[in-house]
């Protein structure tokens, strides 16, 4: 990864801290992984404070496949089965069946409807019957160990929310270019600067978590 592009956002520790401040303020962050992995930047917002303007940005600027990152406990409490029994995808991305709010939506596709679905799913007292399946929101189950167990955007999202002191749920979507290709780090940085969004890498988060655990222990 071209670290020179990232230095404008601070050192790894500072990048994580900036990301956490943004999330606590109800704003988004951009999370990039390694060039040898997906080599993508995901735009991420806290599910807890998600609004229609932010959802519209996810739909407009990203791939349109808006995912809701959940803990394993939340997935089980909502009774969400995995999308497939045998996951043969390259990075074992843990999709569950897709969801829609059972009440308060129309077709489920609009930004408002997708926000409603997200809010319904992450509600503290949410029950399986509050959601219809299939739908237009794609839940992802994070590994319990977070980025220390799996170096994915799903785990990074849940880890960031926990570190920010928020509900451990977030929405993500992969940033794309205007021609539909995937945004790589140079395009991610350009988008971040244009929209005043902090950038953090999964490697930054791994380092931060390891240091944090040392302090705790």
Swiss-Prot record:
The entry marks the following residues as binding D-ribulose 5-phosphate, namely: 37-38, 42, 150-154, 174
Q: Origin, by domain of life?
A: Bacteria
Residues marked Essential for catalytic activity (site): 136, 174
Keyword Manganese on this protein?
A: yes
UniProt GO BP: riboflavin biosynthetic process
Record's function text:
Catalyzes the conversion of D-ribulose 5-phosphate to formate and 3,4-dihydroxy-2-butanone 4-phosphate.
Quaternary context:
Homodimer.
Record-stated family: Belongs to the DHBP synthase family.
Name the chain's protein: 3,4-dihydroxy-2-butanone 4-phosphate synthase
Q: Which organism is it from?
A: Desulforamulus reducens (strain ATCC BAA-1160 / DSM 100696 / MI-1) (Desulfotomaculum reducens)
* Gene it is expressed from: ribB
